[in-house]
Amino acid sequence: DMVSFVSSWTADYNDPDNFIYTFFGTPEKSNVRSLNYFNTDVMSRVAAARGIVDDTKRLTEYAALEKQIVEEDAAWVPMFSRSHLFVKGDRVASFTPHWAGYNDTQYINVTLK
């Protein structure tokens, strides 16, 4: 038997820290989200990763952290990621969706012919 629960999260900003720090950055963050994941080595690495300025090094470290959390420790099991579909009519010259996919009320990136 294994105790588990299901939750959802949508990215607030386009950065892996949005997920990793939010859920695994400190014992308090892990506990309040019912993850009860207390790998202090990972939490120290998350704190250090937040200060990495070089984008390539930073993304490499976040990928390694995700591998540790998901594959090695099995503390988090991503179940799905939403797909966002858009239809563009003949009168639209260009359309650039929001990076996170939601555009239901944002027409600032639309150019008409």
Locate each region found by the language model:
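Short, solvent-exposed loop/beta-turn-alpha elements that line the ligand-binding surface or hinge
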Residues: 1, 21-51, 80-113
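A broad, low-specificity signal for short, low-complexity segments enriched in glycine/proline
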Residues: 8-11, 39-40, 74, 98
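Bilobed periplasmic-binding protein-like "clamshell/Venus-flytrap" ligand-binding domains
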Residues: 5-7, 53-88
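Extracytoplasmic/secreted proteins, especially bacterial periplasmic and envelope-associated proteins
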Residues: 15-19, 41-48, 57-68
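Periplasmic binding protein-like
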Residues: 1-29, 61-62
